[in-house]
Amino acid sequence: MGEREKSASDAPGTVYLVGSGPGDPDLMTVKARRLLEEADVVLHDKLPGPEILGTIPEGKREDVGKRAGGDWTPQEYTNRRMVELARRGKTVVRLKGGDPFVFGRGGEEMEHLAREGIPVEVVPGVTSAVAGPGVAGVPLTHRDHASSVSFVTGHEDPTKEESAVDWRALAETGGTIVVLMGVGKLPEYARALVEAGKRPDTPVALVERATWPDMRVATGTLETIVAVRDREGIEPPAIAVIGEVAATRERVLDLLENAGGEP
């Protein structure tokens, strides 16, 4: 006989909010790998990437990213499902792309679980906000070009009456701006940054599917990047890096070419 399912009177199982990293399985943490093996159920969305999801047996995988017909699964359902499984004594991994606490709604889920009396543990992951630009050859800081970095979401809560992102303040910082999930809103914030005083020729790099086998990188400026996005067909998930550091990739490729090296 298999292990009996715990009753509601038994201690609940633990929910682990696990960051899977930017997509390359080799960039997952050792602890994340171990928990995926030990978990009874893995609740995931699409961001962990096909190579990582492919390592999880189908029998213990549940996709809470989308429903049939393409609609997003409501957050309320995910919250409810985590609690339901934990109260049945299951060890649950809530698998997220990147890091659970970087625009991943990990904070909201942690509070909900605590409110319901469910043990919860956070397992940090390598955030795509840093790893994505890194694998594309775009440093976020550089002694000659940027001494600060700002991370911004390009996909805010649609119920907000107005954006909480102050593009004018970001334009005035002079550092690097990294926009996650920002492909769709690119025209709006590129225009907002120029209107706020950023030079139209400020370099921009778009990194699509960072660290995945089909990763692509496109570069331009605030003035040209929307046309570049459309021409190259850059689609989500993608990261935008705005600032002088975004030109580093092309400089390095030119140096390698002139030196006879491989890009």
Residue map of PLM features:
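Class I S-adenosyl-L-methionine
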Residues: 1-25, 30-126, 131, 226
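A contiguous loop/helix-start segment that scaffolds small-molecule binding in enzyme catalytic cores
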Residues: 2-4, 9-15, 87-92, 148, ...
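Class I SAM-dependent methyltransferase SAM-binding "motif I" and its flanking Rossmann-like core
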Residues: 3-5, 99-173, 216-219
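Short, functionally important structural connectors and interaction interfaces within domains
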Residues: 19-20, 28, 39, 44, ...
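Short, glycine/charged-enriched secondary-structure capping and boundary segments
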Residues: 31-34, 56-59, 77-78, 107-111, ...
